[in-house]
Amino acid sequence: MSNVAAAGFCPFLSAAAPEMFGFDSFTELSKPRDLEKIFDSAEYVQWRSFRDTEDSRFVTLAMPRVLARLPYGQATKPVEAFNYEEVASTSDGRHTETAHDDYCWMNAAYALGTTLTNAFSEYGWCTAIRGAEGGGKVEGLPSHVFVSDDGDTDQKCPTEIGITDRREAELSKLGFLPLCHYKNTDYAVFFGAQTSQRPKKFDNPDATANAAISARLPYVMATSRIAHFLKVMARDKIGSFMEPGEAEAWLNRWISSYVNGSEGASAEAKAQYPLREARVEVKEVPGQPGVYNAVVMMRPWLQMEELTASLRLVANIPKAG
């Protein structure tokens, strides 16, 4: 599937099953102390090999599952044809606690798809898809409130389990894209944008940084769309008398319309013009007259990955006596 997605410059979005982690359900996600040790075992040799391939950047696995709808009932989701209560209720009509698997869950890739369509609808690009303020918020999730066994009012987590910041970073490092629910709200957020690819590390820091960028979904989406444009534009020029230099100038004029090099640009401007710098080089293929090879070099606007805080404490020691 990754080979097909790479050939078509069309990222493949899917979801990881809990069995991939050795769980029966994602509610067990908080139990392991170190997930990385699990994925270093011999059982995951093929997964690690897949992550090291070039085409794995076109695969994104979201997780965990998302609540698809509220349980049927007069107070939650009425059925017009007949009176149906999917969950048992107390004497005052409030729902009681029900089994986790009795809820209707759906693939988290659909939630990820809503962030992509929202970003494209607003900006014309699928780059603003992560962070609470950067387009990664999934709002309006089904919020089922019930009476727990101890008599307290509780909310069913619409993403199966609350994921901590530490576990979210751990999952992203392992090649997954977790959806994190904000407690006592009806929304969740995709903080990361990691594809399945494991970024390679080189001796050159610039090469390492470039590998990390190319493994991020927003940048894969942007470069894939530009690749689609280039293929269609080049097809329309077949049969023309265009020289390599003319083709290069023509393509550079076109791609410059998506570049915004202003350092003080707003977040909206960066979402509409996702490239900070770009250029195209066109060269003739040796031994094949009339066949040109176009190389596109792009520098996108970078999104904040992490903020590390340090504390400095100064204490005055009183003098004795």
Residue ranges and their predicted role:
Residues 86-247, 302, 306-309:
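Long, contiguous, structured domain-core segments that constitute the functional module of a protein
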Residues 279-321:
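C-terminal edge-of-domain segments
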Residues 1, 203-205, 242-252, 263-268, ...:
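Composition- and surface-driven signal marking solvent-exposed, interaction-prone regions
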Residues 6, 272-274, 288-290:
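Solvent-exposed loop and beta-edge segments used for protein-protein assembly and interaction
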Residues 19-23, 197-199, 287-289, 303-305:
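Flexible loop/turn segments at secondary-structure boundaries
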Residues 13-15, 190-193, 283, 297-299:
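Generic beta-strand/beta-sheet core signal
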